[in-house]
Amino acid sequence: MDFVLKMKDKSLKNRKLTREEGLRLFNSNLEELIKEANNIRKEIHGDGIDLCSIINGKSGRCGEDCAFCAQSKYHKTNISEYPLLDYEKIKKVAKENEDEGVHRFSIVTSGRGLYGEEFERVITYYSNLNKELKINLCASHGIINKESLIKLKKAGVKRYHHNLETSRNCYDKICKTHSYEERVKTIKNAKEAGLEVCSGGIIGLGETIIDRIDLAITLRELEIKSIPINVLSAIKGTKLQHMIPLNEEEILRTIAVFRFINPEAKIRLAGGRYLLKNFGENAFKAGANATITGNLLTTCGNKIKDDKRLIENIGMRIF
């Protein structure tokens, strides 16, 4: 049996692919790889696309040194810096997304975490949003303990977002101010608190293909069911400002291999979609079945109406 077909059958039976198999898949025939990744997606998930959106609820002045991030105080970028937004501003954006048919909405805040008065304010925000709107609520507030996560859940949050960013082996090349294990612990805390978890990473940081495969396997081991894949936007003033953008083929290969390794998960297009033709049309044919829509934290995304049109044009549907 052809290797890619053999791996598809293994994936559909939920038998765990090895890193060696993942690497061989990455280097296999592109057309066949994409076709079978798409077949895995169809067989397990059907043709539905999950849409989520975010708001940059607190921007800049972050004390962490993540090499890719425009919000780090270690970088000189031209982003807007502001404290936690007021509730009405956040509610307005959440309501606009709900009215457009977006499934999930998350407040994202800069910094290692959110503490004290700001954390209590955001708990009130979620509680009010949960009462006033129907959109599913997600949260992204950095490294956090289980007690705080339980508070988020009680306030109506269903899912916590916390990316691993890259492999354990590569992590200290992009961040020195906190450890990979702290990120893993946050994910475990969220699961123990009864929250769903959204966690993925960024490709194009200078990592190897093996690093990407190791990330996909770690996410599988953590049983993550929503995996955002960001493609680095090299922002002027950051440590990675001179990184050469990935080409579309490499991005599609990565998405497809993530689908093989994580057949049950939603593979979510996130930052850097502008690097793909028509904001990722081919990615939805390579195993992706979810996307962040609208603007991101410090970069522009695709408009919701344009994403809805794109999804319709490729014969898929928003569920």
Swiss-Prot record:
Its cofactor is [4Fe-4S] cluster; [2Fe-2S] cluster. GO terms for biological process: biotin biosynthetic process. Keywords: 2Fe-2S, 4Fe-4S, Biotin biosynthesis, Iron, Iron-sulfur, Metal-binding, S-adenosyl-L-methionine, Transferase. Catalyzes the conversion of dethiobiotin (DTB) to biotin by the insertion of a sulfur atom into dethiobiotin via a radical-based mechanism. Its EC number is 2.8.1.6. It comes from the Bacteria. Belongs to the radical SAM superfamily. Biotin synthase family. The keyword Aminoacyl-tRNA synthetase does not apply. It holds the Pfam family BATS. One of its GO terms (molecular function) is biotin synthase activity. The keyword Transferase applies. Residues 44-273 form the Radical SAM core domain. Homodimer. SMART domains: BATS, Elp3. [2Fe-2S] cluster binds at residues 106, 138, 198, 268. It catalyses: (4R,5S)-dethiobiotin + (sulfur carrier)-SH + 2 reduced [2Fe-2S]-[ferredoxin] + 2 S-adenosyl-L-methionine = (sulfur carrier)-H + biotin + 2 5'-deoxyadenosine + 2 L-methionine + 2 oxidized [2Fe-2S]-[ferredoxin]. This is Biotin synthase.
